[in-house]
Swiss-Prot record:
PANTHER family per UniProt: NADH-QUINONE OXIDOREDUCTASE SUBUNIT C_D, NADH-UBIQUINONE OXIDOREDUCTASE 49 KDA SUBUNIT
UniProt protein name: NADH-quinone oxidoreductase subunit C/D
Annotated organism of origin: Nitrosococcus oceani (strain ATCC 19707 / BCRC 17464 / JCM 30415 / NCIMB 11848 / C-107)
Subunit relationships: NDH-1 is composed of 13 different subunits. Subunits NuoB, CD, E, F, and G constitute the peripheral sector of the complex.
Membrane topology reported for the UniProt record: Peripheral membrane protein
Gene: nuoC
UniProt EC number: 7.1.1.-
Localization: Cell inner membrane
Major localisation: membrane
Organism taxonomic ancestry: Bacteria, Pseudomonadati, Pseudomonadota, Gammaproteobacteria, Chromatiales
InterPro entries the UniProt entry points to: NADH_DH_suC (IPR010218), NADH_DH_suCD (IPR023062), NADH_Q_OxRdtase_suD (IPR001135), NADH_quin_OxRdtase_su_C/D-like (IPR037232), NADH_UbQ_OxRdtase_30kDa_su (IPR001268), NADH_UbQ_OxRdtase_49kDa_CS (IPR014029), NDH1_su_D/H (IPR022885), NiFe-Hase_large (IPR029014)
Gene Ontology cellular component annotations, sorted alphabetically: NADH dehydrogenase complex; plasma membrane
Amino acid sequence: MRSSLQQPTPPMAGFTPIAEILYHQFGEANFIRQETHDGVPTFWITKAQVSKILRYLKAELAPPYPMLYDLTAIDERVRTHRPGQPASDFTLVYHLLSFIRNEDLRLKVPLQGESPSLPTITPIWPAANWYEREVWDLFGINFEGHPHLSRILLPPTWQGHPLRKDHPARATEVDPFTLSEEKQAREQEALRFRPEDWGMRRASGSTDFMFLNLGPNHPSVHGVFRIVLQLDGEEIVDAVPDIGYHHRGAEKMGERQSWHTYIPYTDRIDYLGGVMNNLPYVLAVEQLAGIQVPERVKVIRVMLAELFRIASHLVFYGTFAQDVGQLSPVFYMFTDRERVFDIIEAICGGRMHPEWFRIGGVAQDLPRGWDDLIRDFLRYLPPRLAKYDKIAMNNRILKKRTQGVGSYTIAEAMEWGVTGPGLRACGLEWDFRKQRPYSGYEQFQFDIPVAQHGDCYDRCWVRIEEMRQSLRIIEQCLNHMPAGSYKADHPLTTPPRKERTMHDIETLISHFLSVSWGPVIPAGEACVGIEATKGNNSYYLISDGHTQPYRVRIRTPSFPHLQMIPLISRGSMVPDLIATLGSIDFVMADVDR
């Protein structure tokens, strides 16, 4: 670990700023630039320009923006702080990512009326398919020319669009729910799969295709997740993933919680990631609030995040081996995970969902003896991982089941929005901790494991090597833990510093208001992404200058990853699909939110 604090990696030098390129190509009069707290270049464009500009940025610009990182919307109708922004009832937000430039680009489209619409961009990015369906589902924005614009997170029979500001947010605001036998029959019928709705044929020549429901209750789909398979014998002709069974309205909840009380909800997104879920959220809030946390806070956060990375990867490793027929590894690895949880419990007081990060710091300082627990674990795990290499990764049956199965290229990964280990498994060395260091990661020495084939085996191998690199990072945290406070000295740090409560009446009132109502975060927008356990996880937060977020957008890695299933399963056998699903490493809470 280097002792000197370095600045995060800036966008690659030598490239013309994107604003100049866009102004030269399309005319400056066609853009309105918006300043944001996160520094991401943000431009407003008209819906008539969307396809032309996005196609240029992806296919004609050199170097391009090859990935549609996110696509979401904002209901602007009750927002008060919008300085310099065009009039808009709803705003569509396109978030693009360029790996060569190491730069993001945000394009916004103002939309008017109760039933706005604009052209689909699925011919440009196939990954837009699910994102546009989600926007239609939750906001009611129509996408002209979309191949199958329908509900994706909510039941087909749902009335309304929940992320509109006029949609009820609490059960007490709607009539009591009842499920009569007639209604139950209608709900079940609405879920009936009809191949024609998806452009599928029931037969080809003399062959009748079989349609198989895999899930939503099946151990190999890792949660309440349904895939409808079109089969010719045991060969997969096509597949239709069906998500939403685990949808809990996490983004809607953010609009009725204070900035502080929303932290426990973030723990439940990737429920195997623990406090790593808190990190992008609190970093984004701190960016909005202008909070600089102490060095000790940064290192504590990194150490806890890497412990949860190991815990999550151990679950992945064991269940992946189980999916392809090895039963022993999962028992060994869950035992190791309990060792990790013992450390986390000693530090945080909780195991899977400690909700321990805070705006401006962490909940408590490290307890006495934390270093001995870490030191023991650093001695314990490496020989265990070496043993697992022998019994699992070197097993010829596991290799036969996973090598060359479920593979994709770097170009396909970018096309579909793949990030994290899934992207590095096909040869691209891209990790937010290196390319865009946050929370002091620039001070740590570690390598980025990269494979070449993009198959099931390589996706597993990358995660195993990541555990070894996480151990390196944790050891540096142990050896170089800075002294100092576990909480920033800032008025918006939440909860505020207790020792100041009784200083005078003003600090007492400030403490009371901050704890009871929550901090008032300045108006603005910020998006922070991190290298989470399953890929890149981002929180895009909008404050309207109140104690609650105006908009909470959660970009999870698992959502686009599952959208790739039809691409990588066509032509394979059903057992190969089971291996592929296990290698993606997803949990449905991360997909459905």
